[in-house]
């Protein structure tokens, strides 16, 4: 249907590697906000993590495709990894709107999913005030953490949601791999196999 209005989730992240916490968070937000689709957007060159070595963008993209393949509401976009230079959310949302318009979704309601800790710092993001006009921001956090809307943010543009599976982190997954400890059940089975085949995260000297 051309020109129809849709509710679309956007989950940007390094996904280094993607894990079940990401997937459960996306699924819960989709359910709570009645989203038709959640688009996962692996970052190209994340400006917040410029000092940390990360896996190649193509590996992170392919892992995200593998991890999301079984859910028909999940899709993956290359808009960030195909764009040169640092990744800023303002560019992600702009390019996604163009991508969605090409599919006939000319005026979607976007719901940007991020960690509640990152949401608390949103006013330091590039063109933050404009960002808040482009999407509704959903901050996800693990149980037991306070769910207070950050001061100064418009309450009608920001929501907070508790997600049980967020006890998992990509940092923990990388450390377990470096220590030769298993990551089964922390990440999808296909990701365990992909990481093993590609030899990702094994070295601590910056090699891959």
From Swiss-Prot:
Catalytic activity: nicotinate beta-D-ribonucleotide + ATP + H(+) = deamido-NAD(+) + diphosphate
Recorded superkingdom: Bacteria
GO biological process: NAD biosynthetic process
Pathway(s) served: Cofactor biosynthesis; NAD(+) biosynthesis; deamido-NAD(+) from nicotinate D-ribonucleotide: step 1/1
Transferase found in the keyword field: yes
Leading EC class: transferase
Family according to the record: Belongs to the NadD family.
Protein name per UniProt: Probable nicotinate-nucleotide adenylyltransferase
Species in which this protein is naturally found: Acidothermus cellulolyticus (strain ATCC 43068 / DSM 8971 / 11B)
Origin organism lineage: Bacteria, Bacillati, Actinomycetota, Actinomycetes, Acidothermales
């Amino acid at each position: 249907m051309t020109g129809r209005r849709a509710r679309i989730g956007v989950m940007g992240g390094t996904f280094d590697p993607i894990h079940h916490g990401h997937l459960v968070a996306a699924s819960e937000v989709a359910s709570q906000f009645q989203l038709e689709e959640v688009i996962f957007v692996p970052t190209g060159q994340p400006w917040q993590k410029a000092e940390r070595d990360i896996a190649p963008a193509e590996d992170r993209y392919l892992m995200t495709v593998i991890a999301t393949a079984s859910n028909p509401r999940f899709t993956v976009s290359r808009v960030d990894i195909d764009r040169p230079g640092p990744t800023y959310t303002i560019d992600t949302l702009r390019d996604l709107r163009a991508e969605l318009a090409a599919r006939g979704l000319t005026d979607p309601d976007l719901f940007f999913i991020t960690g509640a800790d990152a949401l608390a710092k949103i006013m330091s993001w590039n063109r933050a005030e404009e960002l808040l006009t482009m999407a509704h921001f959903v901050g996800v956090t693990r149980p037991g953490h306070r769910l207070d809307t950050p001061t100064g943010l418009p309450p009608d543009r920001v929501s907070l949601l508790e997600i049980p599976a967020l006890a998992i982190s990509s940092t923990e997954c990388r450390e377990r791999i470096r220590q030769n400890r298993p990551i089964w059940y922390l990440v999808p089975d296909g990701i365990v196999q992909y990481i093993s085949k590609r030899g990702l995260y094994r070295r601590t000297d910056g090699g891959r």
